[in-house]
Regions:
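Beta-lactamase-like hydrolase cores
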Residues: 61-109
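Second-shell loop/turn segments in exported
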Residues: 31, 63, 101-110, 148-154, ...
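Active-site SXXK
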Residues: 109-137, 167, 336
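Exposed beta-sheet edge and beta->alpha loop/turn motif
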Residues: 25-71
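Short, glycine/proline-biased beta-turn/loop segments that scaffold the active-site neighborhood
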Residues: 128-156
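Short solvent-exposed beta->alpha transition segments
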Residues: 1-28
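Active-site-adjacent helix/loop patches that line small-molecule binding or acyl-intermediate pockets
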Residues: 154-246, 271
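Structured C-terminal helix/loop/strand segments within mature extracytoplasmic catalytic/sensor domains
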Residues: 62-80, 251-355
Length: 355
């Protein structure tokens, strides 16, 4: 499997020429910068703990393509199969300046990017005195793709800050749904109106991750949901709780390509997400921004070029989205968000990351 990953890098970026740097991040982990003929890759590598210390994990965090330019990036974005778009903005308290954009107003499935709305609402409730980051609640939720809390007992006590950190840094789904439960779906949905969203009819009702998995894996229930009005969809979510629970998810229905990415999803345009990023910049919650910076999305070498780098991504078959909130060493703030959707086949995450 690792050879297949390495071969895919070579096929796309040419031969590996040299290892430019190695930064140790743990007893068996390191981040490497590897120069290829066409790009410089940031790669996280994990070895086994005992001799002969075989490579156990290999993760590409980003590719800096040689000779890149914004015009080339736009051309490459436009050549992607399906639909794609992005926006890059400079942010200030005096206004927002769009520097570069392509299909920035088009709605895309964005996967876990919606979790930034959950973070924004949590920060608002803490700022309003309704909650504290240190408040302790039971986990109470189980779901797939929950790297932080997988197999934890349901009565495990966790702070809201811990849940938020898992939710953003490793996209933990159980943590997300626990926060949705505590904050309230209506309150999180209210962030779309407060911050601004160009097509709330496509984004509401805002599903929990369990609901999304369950709907995607149940064709009969999904078809009912797709044909329903928003009010009817809300009634369905309330009346079909057993069918929309973790135990009802049929993962065998989710392993063969994109499923309902146009109808059972979290929808936003790059411009919508840029508004959300700017709102998180302007909030008085340093804790929320610290949480966004736990996982920079690009590795420590690329992140070190910025004073601050907040990140959230989202992906599933047929969907990838990446959003950044960077602050330059000079103090200037930016928002960058891009998405790529293809309802007919899986997208190439490596290609998108390189853009």
């Amino acid at each position: 499997q690792i050879k297949a990953i390495s071969d895919s890098f070579t096929q796309q970026y040419g031969k590996a020429l040299s290892v430019q740097s190695v930064q140790r991040s743990g007893p068996n982990n390191a981040t490497l910068e590897v120069e290829y003929e066409k790009a410089v890759a940031t790669i996280e590598i994990t070895t086994e703990a005992s001799p002969p210390f075989k490579v156990a994990g290999l993760l590409a965090k980003g590719f800096a393509v040689k000779g890149d330019s914004i015009d080339k990036i736009k051309t490459d974005f436009g050549a992607l199969s399906g639909t794609s778009g992005f926006v890059v903005q400079k942010l200030s308290d005096d206004g927002v300046a769009t520097l570069h954009a392509l299909n920035a107003d088009k709605q895309f499935a964005t996967g876990s990017t919606f979790k930034l709305y959950v973070l924004a609402e949590l920060a608002s409730q803490v700022a309003g005195g309704q909650r504290r980051w240190s408040d302790v609640v039971p986990l109470g939720v189980r779901n797939h793709s929950s790297a932080g809390t997988q197999n934890w007992p349901l009565d495990t006590p966790v702070t809201l800050q811990t849940l938020a950190t898992w939710m953003i840094s490793v996209s933990d789904n159980a943590s997300t749904d626990a926060l949705m439960r505590e904050l309230g779906r209506d309150a999180v949905e209210g962030k779309l109106a407060t911050i601004g969203h160009s097509a709330p009819d496509k984004a509401l009702p805002m599903l929990t991750t369990v609901e999304a998995f369950a709907l995607k894996s149940n064709p009969t229930l999904r078809q009912r949901f797709e044909k329903a009005s928003e009010a009817e969809q809300r009634d369905l979510l309330a009346s079909e709780r057993a069918a929309l629970s973790y135990g009802a998810i049929n993962m065998s229905q989710l392993g063969s390509g994109p499923v309902a990415i146009d109808s059972v999803e979290w929808s936003a345009s790059p411009q919508d997400t840029a508004l959300l990023l700017n709102s998180l910049r302007r909030t008085n919650s340093q804790t929320a921004r610290d949480i966004m910076a736990v996982n920079s999305g690009v590795g420590p070498t690329a992140a070190s070029k910025w004073r601050y780098l907040g990140y959230k991504g989202g992906s599933e078959p047929g969907v990838i989205s990446m959003s950044f909130l960077p602050q330059s060493k000079a103090g200037d703030w930016y928002a960058s968000s891009g998405s790529w959707n293809n309802p007919a086949k899986e997208v190439d995450n490596g290609v998108f990351v390189s853009l």
